[in-house]
Design a protein with these regions (language model features):
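Conserved phosphate- and dinucleotide-binding cores of soluble alpha/beta proteins
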Residues: 1-80, 84-104, 117-192
Length: 192
């Protein structure tokens, strides 16, 4: 949609041309051309991270962020970027965050796509709501099953609003944290 804001041309490559789709991430009248691909195109998940690839240093940084930034400043509403650092934070909330007594005090409201690494925090009652920029391949059934957390329409599909999420993600939250945490040798973080 950023292309359309600058008078660009938007071309959508699709597997099949149909009369109706359940949902799209941008308004249909912003799409100038629809082209059917000669063979089905595999859509890779954008935000899914294999937890086995999270390193010890990423876990350490996640623990530092949970205790030293989120806990210290009472970060309730946040926009998590993508990457292993934020995935580690999400996975540590029900264990390390719980140990610190931070449940209900941090990380209750998110502006982000539905990350699988957020599931343990959702299921353990940490996360109250998630407003998404868009979808995530493979998360459709989980999102539909949790209309109490995600914005879901009457047909069971997720409702997202990229423009609203981007605005909220930058101006209506306690903190935006990027996919790469920058911490200097003195422990100062660019995210605080």
């Amino acid at each position: 949609e950023a292309t359309k804001f600058k008078q660009g041309i938007v071309v959508a490559q699709v597997n099949e041309i149909v009369d109706e789709v359940p949902r799209v991430d941008i308004p249909g009248d912003w799409v100038d051309f629809v082209v059917q691909a000669p063979k089905p195109f595999y859509v890779e998940p954008l935000f899914t991270r294999d937890p086995a690839l999270i390193t010890d240093s990423q876990v350490l940084r996640a623990m530092m962020v949970i205790k030293g930034i989120y806990g210290e400043y009472g970060i309730q509403r946040l926009n998590h970027g993508i990457g292993f650092d934020t995935a580690a934070i999400e996975l540590l909330l029900p264990t390390y965050g719980e140990e610190l007594g931070l449940k209900g005090k941090i990380c209750s409201y998110f502006s982000l796509n539905p990350h699988p690494t957020l599931i343990p925090a959702i299921e353990s009652g940490w996360v109250k709501s998630v407003h998404s920029f868009g979808g995530e391949v493979g998360m459709e059934d989980y999102v539909a099953a949790r209309p109490d957390v995600f914005f879901v329409g009457p047909d069971g599909t997720m409702r997202s609003n990229r423009a609203f999420s981007q605005t909220a993600g930058h101006y209506a939250l306690d903190l935006f944290i990027g996919g790469t945490l920058q911490i200097d040798k003195y422990g100062n973080s660019s995210t605080a």
